[in-house]
Amino acid sequence: IDEDGYVMNDETTEVLVKQALSHAEAGADVVAPSDMMDGRIGKIREALENAGYIHTQIMAYSAKYASNYYGPFRDAVGSSSNLKGGNKKNYQMDPANIDEAIHEVALDINEGADMVMVKPGMPYLDVVRRVKTELQVPTFAYQVSGEYAMHKAAIMNGWLKEREIVMESLLC
């Protein structure tokens, strides 16, 4: 984090490259950096190929939103304070801008991503559909803790049936 509270893109990307190489060396078939740093997919792809891991695939978290749906997880692991006053909104996606999502996904594909993630999934099914239709790459949606918490609260209140809603929510 710099003095203005921003995550340092280039330094973070260097760490992500080291992590991806470590996973590939350990035998991972797919690496999936859970971040939104600019240029990280190209750097990871280059490092993997230079190290001979030409078959290691990359799942890019291309559309990772600055979402309140992460709240229960961040509270559970105490990660809200990790940024020391920083804000993930300065590098995660604006929920109101679907065109930015398509642009970011396209950049990651051009840099070498084999598949992409939209996170969280449920509130952004419009993004999932556009990515799949317009960019035609394997597309995954991530159900985060806030989505689970909504379902669990409704189940506990008797508004939804647990098995049915869990199965329905995973059909994306």
Language model features: what each stretch is:
Residues 1-172:
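Alpha/beta enzyme core
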